[in-house]
């Protein structure tokens, strides 16, 4: 398995991959919890949402927020990105939820190769506290316009 591809391809899972790579072992989360995330995403037809929940080490909340600002601004300009927002849990300030909406898997793949994304993931690799969780969703009720 090409770990650098996995690093980019699994979005916020990348910070756990980076930790594992530093120890010369397989990424535990990729193996145990999300072995087929990219395969699952590839099966999605059309637009989809990706919800990623993760925690950072206590005291690193501001580090994440500062690192996320340029990535969020650049990502919202990317082809196929309809939503890209970082939310912070009000009851547990070390917990964050990234809500993304993409026109296609191909658009998400391009996003994962962007320098601003790689930079954010590199920061997350240093400050993450545990593995992320992922939800792949399809919007079923359209808002009224």
Regions found by a protein language model. Give the residues of each.
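Bacterial N-terminal signal peptides that target proteins for export
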Residues: 1-8
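Bacterial N-terminal signal peptides
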Residues: 8-18
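Glycine-rich beta-strand-turn "strand-cap" elements at beta-sheet edges
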Residues: 23-47, 86-91, 120-145
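Short, glycine- and small/hydrophobic-rich beta-strand elements in well-ordered beta-sheets
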Residues: 39, 72-97
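Short, well-ordered beta-strand segments in beta-rich or mixed alpha/beta enzyme
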Residues: 48-55, 85-112
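Short amphipathic alpha-helical segments
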Residues: 58-83, 116-120
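Sec/Tat-exported extracytoplasmic proteins
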Residues: 76-79, 112, 124, 128-131
């Amino acid at each position: 398995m090409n770990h650098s591809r996995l690093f980019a391809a699994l979005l916020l899972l990348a910070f756990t991959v980076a930790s594992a790579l530093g120890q010369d072992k397989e990424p535990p989360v990729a193996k145990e919890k999300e072995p087929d995330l990219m395969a699952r995403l590839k099966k999605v037809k059309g637009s989809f949402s990706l919800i990623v929940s993760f925690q950072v080490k206590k005291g690193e909340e501001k580090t994440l927020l500062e690192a996320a600002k340029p990535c969020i601004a650049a990502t919202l300009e990317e082809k196929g990105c309809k939503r890209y927002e970082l939310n912070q849990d009000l009851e547990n300030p070390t917990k964050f939820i990234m809500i993304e909406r993409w026109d296609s898997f191909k658009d998400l793949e391009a996003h994962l190769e962007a320098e601003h994304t790689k930079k954010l993931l590199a920061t997350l690799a240093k400050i993450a506290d545990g593995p992320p969780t992922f939800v792949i969703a399809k919007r079923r009720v359209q808002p009224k316009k």
